[in-house]
Amino acid sequence: MQKILRVMIIIAMLITAYLLILAWRDDYADAPAVETTPNAATTVGGDIPSTTGAAGDIPAQTIPVDNGLATTTPAQDTNLISVTTDRYDLKINPEGGDIVYAALKQYDATLDSDEPFVLLENNSNRVYVAQSGLIGPNGIDTADGRASYRSAADSYTMKEGQQTLSVPLTYQQDGVTVTKTYTFTHGKYPIDVSYQIQNRSEQPWQGQMFAQLKRDDSKDPGMSDKGALSMATYLGGAWGTPDDPYNKLKFNKFSNDELNVASDEGWVGIVQHYFVSAWTPDNFTGQFFSRETGNDYFIGFNSQPVNIAANKQLTLDATLYAGPKVQSELKEVAVGLNQTVDYGLLWPISKILFAILDGIHKVLGNWGWSIIVLTILVKISLMWFSNKSYYSMAKMRSLAPRLAALKEEHGDDRMKMSQEMMSIYKEEKVNPMAGCLPILMQMPIFLALYWVLVESVELRHAPWILWIQDLSAMDPWFILPLLMGVSMYIQQQLNPQPTDPMQAKVMK
């Protein structure tokens, strides 16, 4: 029993040391968190990107606009437009046409709940919405208020067999008709957002599109049911371009004007555990930005300014992804968006392990058994190194009498004894450190596998057998850690004991 306790203490110390290193990196590797101050009131005007370059706004644009100082009160939830698809339950606010609620129907909020996981929402507990609009000299979204769209219906539902669902919103002002259309595709999370601007006036129309995510400083709701021993994962902004696919931008860096990048194929978003929301421009170059207003954080892009002549029209398009971090789907949206599944420094190994794990799952259909098979395959792949270790240990045992004789002969002269020992090792072609080789090879592989298990949304609420009904959560009864400790003790007893009495005592 004492031996088992020693093994478990060693394992606990190693795990604790690793967790402390990760916690130190999260707490001290970057600047301290931004000091939060209460908001006096929530305003619509503060949500609109300014083109004046004022403090707290996005960088100055090529077309200036006077946003004014007036603010308005957001529309009430009773006027929201409901949208139901095979993937989403959404609500759109006619004031601005923003998505203010998005529930993912294929993901439960908790393991024992039938309620869907809510990614976007706008209430007293959390503010996290996807906004877009038109700004500039003739823009319909200003600090004075958002455009109030009209809709042909209060609710839209994707029927069985229907491949796409369009939700058109219209707004008219001074001879200009703006049609903002959300297009949903069956079986997919990306949402197409288009602005068709028809200028029937006698004057040219000037403006630009913006798309952004607005989030407050509330915690990640996906981490609330993981327990006190769960590993904290990244919550913050991120962006990428084809030349620089994945970059993190913590909330406490949003107000530093660090994000000033233009791209026509990039993306910008907010990342949390298992889920991500991101905007990407489709047919124009977007100027990425981030900013902070009180407790609210904004990250998004502005389009280049456009000029629409009288009696002409133009369409601006963007794509919103709001869903799980499924790598195969993220790849189709934008380059580098799949890297929001963040495996850390060991990502090359992790990607290979996940590809193998995913392939095994397609055959077995159970993620738990797939993990076991993957672990066995990893052990088999390291068998050559283990055999080298066993061979070295056997050679060391055969050399034990000669080494003991050296110790008696040169016991007082450690330098001479070391030289003679190295000579024997060289003569017999033995590496005394070869016994550590399997451990050195296994550590990066199993650490990479650990991050695969932590980051893969496929394991969220995935059952295995018996009491293990969520592979993303720790064992509630700690049975698996106990079994691991027992197996390590048995494996230790099966290994040959060192011939040196002191080494044998240490290994007991």
What does each model-identified segment do?
Residues M1-A40, I92, Y195, Q208-M231, ...:
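Helix-loop-helix
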Residues L80-Q339:
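Soluble non-transmembrane domains of integral membrane proteins
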